[in-house]
UniProtKB/Swiss-Prot annotation:
Domain of life of the native organism: Viruses
Gene this chain is encoded by: 5
Name of this chain's protein: Protein 5
Amino acid sequence: MDELRLIGRCIAVKMVSPRPRTSLTRGDFRGVSWDKREWKAIIKRRGSRFVRAELIPRSRDDNGQCISILFSDDTSGITMSAGVCKFLLVFDPTVEIFLDIPRDAQLNDSITFEELDPPVTISPY
């Protein structure tokens, strides 16, 4: 199993009001309900580069919508948007890793995710 590393900054954190009904735009999370549900982020790779991800509500009761978020094309400067305080990053079909985003995070806050020591626990997906 490959070693998992995520080193980068979350530079587009945005809180949203409950159940807004506006359209989703690039780099924004309008249209996402603000609650404590976990969202699953499926990262799409191009070779060794992280290029995009889809953020999906784990309970697909919001019309099963998928929300695309754009990543930078290298792992040193990952850019993502987030509208919930916790979501699940799935790096491949067999492992999962949880990351927390502070509830008081504001737009353009810098949040650094670095490899934990000891490493985070991974479990089958």
